[in-house]
Amino acid sequence: DLGEGSVNFKWASEKLMANNKVIYRGQPVAAIAAIDRHVAEEAARKILVEYEVLDSVTNVVDAMKENAPIILEDLIGDDLGEKIHNTNMSEHIRHDFGDVEKSMEDSDHIFEGEFNMEMVHQGYIEPHNATAVWNEDDQIKIWTSTQGAFPARTQIAGILQVNVSQVKVTPLEIGGGFGGKIPVYFEPIAAILSKKSGRPVKMVMERTAIFETTGPTPGGKIKVKLGVNNDMKINSAISEIWFEAGANPGGMIGPAAMCIYAPYNIPNMRIDAWDILVNKPKIAAYRAPGS
């Protein structure tokens, strides 16, 4: 049990570097180490990549259509315990409390609403940066701007397929994060380049790359139906939450489903939430997971 550092390392590694198929705009396809930035940029310009343009989905409605392009062909979705293939739905969860149908019928007033959200980036001032050293004894030292040193260590070790004891992550003082600097992005790449070059490797992400490739808060759609009595107490609530996960599964539907009615004492509730893949970077926390 890896707790908050739990991650599917196969998908995590494919998030960092495209493998056969680019699944979101800006996804890295190659990495270069050089003695300085100018040499690296010159080498990068010499790399030619041929792309076959594929159909994409960029919102939860299009992603759930019957003939929608499938982002991850090997994804097996979990629909309330039922395994689903050939889908962009990673997970469907439900919370049930009380007798929702009867309480809704007994309510004096019914209110319904639909709320659509766009992805929003955290907008931290300091860019992502990391320095990695892969020593000859296979001990890996990484200095990085992160909000979660231990989750980062777990993810880096899993992606590099080394023991956690081989990885030391030193978190640096960060210039803003707001939840967006918990995932790892290029730390494992810096480590591999260090191993190949035999030198320390420093990487700093440009602002365009930050907006294109690092995790924003999820976009999505929420439907709400409330049964309210004449005394203005909420008697019944039904919600459907569709959240973008990005191009890899594992979004924020769990916290969202738990917290949507947290400020209220509602005796009868049904909350359904779906984790939906779209051709965007993997989402991350923004202020608080699921907020």
Regions found by a protein language model. Give the residues of each.
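Glycine-rich and small/hydrophobic secondary-structure elements
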Residues: N8-A40, G180-N230, I283-S291
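Structural signal for hydrophobic packing residues in well-ordered secondary-structure cores
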Residues: H38, A44-D55, A68, F97, ...
